Amino acid sequence: MSEKKDILERLSSLLIERKNYTEDNSYTNQLYSAGNAKILKKIEEEASELIEAGSEERVIKKEIVHEAADLWFHTMVLLAFNEINPLEILN
């Protein structure tokens, strides 16, 4: 579990860095600039895409993994935007 916590901590740190480095024109910074509502909208979109991928008559594991990763990423962006450490969820 420690290795997984390390990955969460590293990703969280990177997302916070991006938030604080406003000159970066990355996708992540574009989300931060657009604000909380835009980030929530992306989470809604990604959740819908994950549900759709999992609901297909012929479920394709690769698509579910891809959509789940997108949902996790945008959720991590929301946490960083609101200064919430993901380890709070694990506790």
Regions found by a protein language model. Name each.
Residues 1-68, 72-91:
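Flexible "arm" and connector segments at domain edges
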